[in-house]
A protein has these predicted regions:
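Hydrophobic alpha-helical transmembrane segments
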Residues: 1-95, 111-120, 125-159
Length: 159
């Protein structure tokens, strides 16, 4: 069942070109998460260029889910499993968007030398390279070690 939050008595207000105060917020949630916000509302394409002001709120949403997994999960499961589950929750919620950007960055600057055009071409390439793989492995190991070294409460607050 799809719910449309745009249902108004005036059909002209539901046109694709109309703008609501929440369009940029919705665009940020749709772009930065894999949660099905698009089922509730389809913001105009122009809203996607103005999502910067909503980055903190989307971060609170994804970070809050990870923090809740750490805090509440530690009450019912062994902590090492909870740490892995919290990381998986974030990866699933964001579609690994940040990890993809990190891998592109590391591949570009690791393999591109000093040639700006080569760096940009490598960063645009959809294939992952050695620097991207190594960087992601080290990043995830560092995240695991950091979260595992903290109490569940401190880890949840740190996220």
């Amino acid at each position: 069942m799809e719910i449309n939050i745009d249902q108004t008595k005036n059909p002209e207000q539901n046109s694709p070109n109309s703008s609501h105060w929440y369009d940029n917020l919705w665009a940020a949630f749709i772009f930065f998460t894999r949660l099905p916000f698009w089922r509730l509302h389809q913001p105009p394409k122009s809203s996607y260029s103005a999502v910067v002001e909503w980055w903190p709120l989307t971060g609170w949403l994804t970070g809050g889910a990870m923090a809740a997994t750490l805090y509440f999960g530690s009450m019912v499961m062994p902590y090492p499993i909870v740490v892995i589950a919290a990381i998986v929750v974030r990866l699933l919620m964001t579609g690994a968007l940040h990890e993809d950007g990190l891998a592109d960055f590391l591949d570009g600057f690791g393999g591109g030398g000093t040639d700006r055009q080569r760096i940009l071409a490598i960063m645009k390439d959809s294939h992952i390279g050695t620097y991207g793989v190594l960087g992601l492995i080290l990043y995830e190991l560092l995240l695991l070690a950091a979260l595992f070294s903290m109490s569940p409460e401190m880890a949840a607050l740190t996220i």
